[in-house]
Amino acid sequence: MRDLMRRRLKEKRQLPVLLCGLFLPFGQLAAREADVDRFSASLKIAAVNGVKLHYFQNGSGVPVILIHGGLGDYREWSAQIEPFSQHYRVLDYSRRYNYPNDNSERPDHSAIVEAQDLGALLDALKLERVHLVGYSYGALTALFFATQHPERLRSLTLAEPAIMKWLLEIPGGQAELDKFMTTMWKPAGDAFRKEQPETALRITCDYFSGKGSYDKLPTEGRRLLMSDVREWKALTTSQDPFPMLDRDVVRRLKMPTLLITGEKTLNPLRMIIEELSRVMPAAERVTIPGATHDMWLEEPEACGKATLSFLGRH
């Protein structure tokens, strides 16, 4: 199994373009495709909060909840299921608009809605106190849930949460936010409103990985992105996709917290993680050498080991 994972990672690095982005877990496209059959037979469905969520459980003991990033789904955690489930009961689920869920779209989607879904899912599965591990937009979801239900968390692991509105109060952050919104976010939303999802993905990839990067993707890569495109549409057309998190509320969180960042991450995410470290001075912090925002996909072993080490102490 480990040799297979290593081969998949090698194939991933040989893709024409390694797409790293703010919420985009594209890096391990080939491996994610190969894992469909491996996990699909074990998927279950929970009807919660007016939607149906596909989820996968493995292992036993204290629950660890894995929350994927944007334009991704439960499959992006495939490399973590085996090592994590040796010690914990792992719950890996797809958020409401991500593959293979087929929920009707509702206006003004946000991480607040995702946090409500998470709470309802935990209630349905009778999980009281859990470890939360969130990546990118999934980390933003985890952080909102933590501020609303701190008593339910044993620990909180945040891999570069997209707290975009904090950039407004960080030196140099306004310029980064403006670039993000005007170059990619708003044009992608406009493309979705014109029913042009592939154009929206092309705009997104151009921003994060350079012009023409989408067109260099193999066919299976485009298909995988398209399988999760409904979430991207819901977010880029929302009136408030990045709700403001009150710094004082975050500062009062007392559960053990781990912050994970990539050494070569994007400027806005570096600014946000630095600010989060300042707001949560007791939080532990790990930097993954050589990694971008796609750290969990580029360096799954390093990310997994860092997280398991942290969980083992809490």
Where are each of the predicted segments found?
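Flexible "cap/lid" loop of the alpha/beta hydrolase fold
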Residues: 153-189
